[in-house]
Design a protein with these regions (language model features):
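Basic, flexible linker segments flanking DNA-binding modules
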Residues: 1-78, 169-170, 223-229
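Two-metal-ion RNase H-like nuclease active-site motif
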Residues: 77-86
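Active-site beta-loop-alpha junctions of metal-dependent nucleic acid enzymes
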Residues: 88, 92, 110-132
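Short loop/turn microsegments at loop-to-beta-strand junctions
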Residues: 94-96
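Short, acidic, Ser/Thr-enriched surface-loop or helix-capping motifs
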Residues: 101-102
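Acidic/histidine-rich, metal-coordinating catalytic segments
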Residues: 125, 132-148, 222-225
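RNase H-like polynucleotidyl transferase catalytic core
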Residues: 138-142, 157-175, 191-196
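C-terminal domain-tail junction helix/linker
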Residues: 158-160, 181-229
Length: 229
């Protein structure tokens, strides 16, 4: 590797840290520290160096039966929830909790915080339920927050069914995964957040547009709000 590329590689490594960041976010952070480096050069070194988002290995859980998605005919029949991670300009990690109604692809809410343990997950869901009503089922992956005793007790007390996807089968949560991709491209990777408040502000603005203005092919080219009307 040429000497100049080694310098770029070291600059990339210095901003990657241990938190999840997309390629575009990496490029922006490198350029913030090294304004003289062009985006195309950083991208080339990034790709040639084989940088990728690493996966954490968790303790193996007993698997559950296949759980394919069935699109509901009414709202509040099944929600899907999932986490995402990003990083502030200062380097501190943030997390988001995304809640989607499978019926009309509406995003019921996005909680943005430094950490989102099961307690905060429950608080976020209770705020959404207060505004939109209670779902029959909630679909999740096998994350520790969802498998926790606190979250499982809350589901039972509220008579909400838990629809857990199989480990290693993200396609069983394809609707929220597709939403996550859009949110990452439009918001997380497109911006450098100066603070938690900044991330929340941009997320709130984008969320309104997503629900009220963005047309969805799967909804006959209607917005989520219009489809549910």
């Amino acid at each position: 590797m040429p000497g100049k590329d080694i310098v770029v590689k070291q600059a990339i490594e210095s901003v990657m840290g241990s938190t999840r960041k997309g390629r575009n976010k990496i490029i922006r952070l490198v350029q913030k520290n090294h304004p003289h480096l062009g985006a195309s050069k950083i991208r080339r070194v990034y790709e040639r160096s084989g940088f990728s988002l690493s996966k954490k290995w968790r303790r193996r859980m007993k698997d559950n039966p296949a759980n394919p998605i069935s699109i509901p005919l009414v709202a509040n029949e099944e929600w899907a929830i999932d986490f995402m991670c990003d990083v502030l300009e200062e380097g501190r990690q943030i997390r988001t909790l995304n809640v989607i109604d499978h019926f009309n692809r509406q995003c019921m809410g996005i909680s943005v915080d430094y950490s989102l343990p099961s307690r905060k997950v429950i608080e976020a869901l209770e705020r959404i339920i207060e505004q939109h009503g209670k779902p029959i089922r909630i679909r999740t992956d096998n994350g520790s927050e969802f498998c926790s005793k606190r979250f499982q007790l809350w589901l039972r007390e509220n008579k909400i069914e838990w629809s857990r996807i199989q480990k290693g089968k993200p396609q069983q949560n394809a609707i929220v995964e597709r939403f996550n991709k859009t949110y990452r491209e439009d918001v997380l990777d497109a911006n450098l957040f100066s603070s938690l408040a900044h991330a929340r502000e941009l997320t709130t603005k984008w969320l309104w547009d997503y629900n009220n203005e963005r047309l969805h092919e799967s909804l006959n080219y209607l917005t989520p709000i219009a489809y549910a009307a």
